[in-house]
Structures are given as C-alpha cells and as structure tokens.
C-alpha cells in the first residue's frame, strides 16, 4: 500500500513522516479511549496521557521507515512502543506537536487550514497599538492557564474562544503575519499547553485545585498563593521566554 510521506526538519536534521494506514488510525482511536479511564481531577495523569498520545501517533508514522520495523517479528505494537519511548525521551515537545499535526494532515485526520482571500473592498481591523510577541504570549498564557486550572486536558480552541475580540485580534495578527504559518498554529498551541501543564505538576505544592478560578475551595485560598503574573512569568521561563519573529524583533 502506498503511503504519503513528508520530511520533518529540525536543527539541520530530518526524519520522514508517513501517512497512517487505516488500521493504524483505528489503533490510534483505541489508544485514545484510555483517556476515559483517567480519573476526573487527576490532572497529572491526564496531561501525561496527552503527551504520550502525541508521541504514540508520531511513532506509528515513523515506524514505516524506522530501523526497528520488523525487528520484533509480528509484534509491530512492541516496535511502535519502543519508537514512542525514543520520541518522548529525545524530542522537544514542540517538535512532537508539530510532527503530530503533520501526521494528522497526511492521514486525513484533520483538514488543512485555508486562508480566505480578502476582497479588495474589505477593510482589515488593525490593533490600536503594535502587537508584540510579549503581548501575544501574555494572552496565550492567561487563557491556557485558565483552561489548565479548570480542565485536566486543555483545548486551545476553547482557549481562543475565551479571548476577548481585542485579545484574539492581537494574537491572530502577530502569529499569522509575523511568525507562524497557519499550518503551524495547531502545533504551536499543543506545545504551549504542554508548557502550561508542566507548570502545574513541576511543583508538588502547585495544583489546579489550589488555583481554581471558577470554584476555589475555601481551604485552598491563601494570600500567599502566586497571582497570574507570577504564574505567567514561570510559564514563560519554562517555554524559553518571549518568542521572536523572523526578523529578530520582539
């Protein structure tokens, strides 16, 4: 069976991603069903599953051209599991997220993003002030943290839906025009949410229940709890700080 493929490049190295077979897509759905077994409120388990599921999808794609293919006889699942471990241990999360997105595109699991041309008579709403990477990142972190606090498995599309029109406009203009291609946005937000998630289980004393925005437990309210600005600073540090555009500007 012919499978489509695409190169994924990072820091001068490249790997070939392959389209998933029909059987692999079914296996992926079965793997995702494991999420239902994660106990409600078990934030760390849910986030760990999110990261592992992305690595699993990438591993199934890499398997078609990987040296491990056929090494376990008929046990392809064991081969994929070894590749998954390799991906989780050696790939940065943003690269895993980008690869996951590309594999889903190759496999027809998601539709490609298509920009609608702007008509000549249509005016484009510009922000009142210049949009910087720091400002856009602040909007991302604010809503990513809110989603991370309230739900075990944040959804970046829901995060965007929670933005005000001004915040969304700032985010869209900066990332669409200055840094990312549209096709990279899913990968970018997956990586960002991994970053936010890391913030909550990196410190044993910092849990979503302690900082619930919608329904904080009375015993969890403490004047010493860090505010959003502090959490955002920590998250920015985890993700490597402020992002830069292709021209080096903030």
Curated annotation (Swiss-Prot):
It holds the Pfam family Phage_tail_T. Its main location: host cell. GO terms for biological process: viral tail assembly; viral translational frameshifting. It is found in: Host cytoplasm. GO terms for cellular component: host cell cytoplasm. Keywords: Host cytoplasm, Late protein, Viral release from host cell, Viral tail assembly. Belongs to the lambda-like tail assembly protein family. Promotes tail assembly by creating a scaffold for the tail tube proteins. Tail assembly proteins G and GT probably wrap the linear tape measure protein to create a tail assembly scaffold. This allows the polymerization of the tail tube protein, during which G and GT are released, therefore they are absent in the mature virion. The tail assembly protein GT is produced by a rare -1 ribosomal frameshift. The ratio of translated G/GT is about 20, and this ratio is important for proper tail assembly. Interacts (via C-terminus) with tail tube protein. Interacts (via N-terminus) with the tail assembly protein G and the tape measure protein. This is Tail assembly protein GT.
